[in-house]
């Protein structure tokens, strides 16, 4: 059995299951919520080790937190960093089924 660095589990927080992310999966792309301080090389290494696939590229974005009102007080949700991971041809991660 291959050894997986426990830090890889900290980099990838969860898969993002939205309509847009599901449509991107048809083009060999998977969207993950990642640690806010994670770099593209760290994300690439974590995905390759955890899911045993080859990564072609990694694009990241930060979704700014929304302003919300709760019982008359205003607050802001936390910012979320997302990574759009493009996989090499022939490799696949299916996060939309089996949930």
UniProtKB/Swiss-Prot annotation:
GO terms for biological process: translation. One of its GO terms (molecular function) is structural constituent of ribosome. Belongs to the universal ribosomal protein uL23 family. PROSITE patterns: RIBOSOMAL_L23. InterPro entries: Nucleotide-bd_a/b_plait_sf, Ribosomal_uL23-like, Ribosomal_uL23/eL15/eS24_sf, Ribosomal_uL23_CS. The gene is rplW. Part of the 50S ribosomal subunit. Contacts protein L29, and trigger factor when it is bound to the ribosome. HAMAP family: Ribosomal_uL23_B. One of the early assembly proteins it binds 23S rRNA. One of the proteins that surrounds the polypeptide exit tunnel on the outside of the ribosome. Forms the main docking site for trigger factor binding to the ribosome. Keywords: Ribonucleoprotein, Ribosomal protein, RNA-binding, rRNA-binding. GO terms for cellular component: ribonucleoprotein complex; ribosome. This is Large ribosomal subunit protein uL23. Gene3D superfamilies: 3.30.70.330.
